[in-house]
Structure formats: C-alpha cells, structure tokens
A protein has these predicted regions:
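Short beta-strand element of the alpha/beta-hydrolase
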Residues: 44-54
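Primarily recognizes the serine-hydrolase "nucleophile elbow" in alpha/beta-hydrolase
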Residues: 102-143
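Short beta-to-alpha linker loops that shape the active-site pocket of alpha/beta-hydrolase fold enzymes
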Residues: 53, 85-89
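N-terminal cap/lid segment of alpha/beta-hydrolase-fold proteins
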Residues: 14-42
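Sec-dependent signal peptide recognition
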Residues: 2-10
Length: 143
C-alpha cells in the first residue's frame, strides 16, 4: 500500500467529531470497569473495539482519536459499535483476558437481542486492546 493510500485511510479521524456520542452502558460483571458502551448505528454491522493502555491504564472513553474513529464508524459507516472496558492495573493478568472474553459473550447476547448481523462482526483494538482482540479469536469458546 503506498503512502497516499495510508494517509487517505486516516482522513476520517480528522473529520469526525471527538465528542462522545450517546451510548447505552451494558454491565457484564461486578467491577465498574466491566462495562461495555453501545453506540447504535443504522445497519446491522458490528464493530467491537477494545482500548489499549499497556494493560495498566486507559479506558474505553479516554482516547480522543479513538472517539473520532468510533464516531466515524457510527455516523458515516453506520456500524453498531461496542466499546469494551476491562480491569487494568497491577493485577490485570489474567483478568483483562477473562474480562474481554466475558464481554464478548455478553455482546453476542446483545447482538441477538438487537437482531444485528452475526456475519458482519469486526473485533479490533489498539495496542493491548489488539492483543486482547486476538485472545478472543484464540479463545476455546470461539474456535
């Protein structure tokens, strides 16, 4: 992929608003970090996003460029976006992995309840969130 193509992929991040859109919070555990923000799109496509932060810091709403990214997917690509929060800090392993897998299970139930597509699901994340997205894919529950 050439440099121009890569730059063009970033344009939505600069155009989209970084305001927090209206969302519904869905709990999947007892800890306050064990929550998912759901942003309703106008199609049945689904994006599941897991924030980064080196397993030590961060939050599903803390990264400004991530808010722009999600807003773009909700407002312009019409995705339904689920943003996963998980336990972080000194005792994050194995809690972060377990939390994200539990959150994914909860999201699958939400997808069914909201009659969204099980065929159009993207699971992604930044940094530690990318690792956790990969762990969902490698989970025995989803092979």
């Amino acid at each position: 992929m050439n440099y121009l193509s890569r730059f063009l992929l970033l344009i939505p991040l600069f155009i989209a608003s970084d305001e927090i859109l209206d969302s519904v919070e869905i709990s999947y555990g007892d800890n306050t970090k064990q929550a998912i923000d759901f942003y309703k799109g106008s199609t049945d496509k689904v994006l599941i996003w897991i924030h980064g932060g080196g397993w030590l810091y961060g939050d599903k709403r803390s990264e400004r460029w991530i808010r722009r990214f999600h807003n773009h997917f909700v407002e312009h690509e019409d995705f339904n976006v689920f943003m996963i929060g998980y336990r972080i800090g000194e005792a994050s392993a194995p809690y972060a992995v377990n939390d994200v897998i539990c959150a994914y299970d909860r999201i699958i139930r939400e997808i069914e309840l909201r009659e969204l597509s099980m065929d159009d699901i993207i699971v992604a994340g930044a940094s530690a969130g990318g690792h956790l997205a990969l762990m969902v894919g490698y989970s025995e529950n989803y092979k």
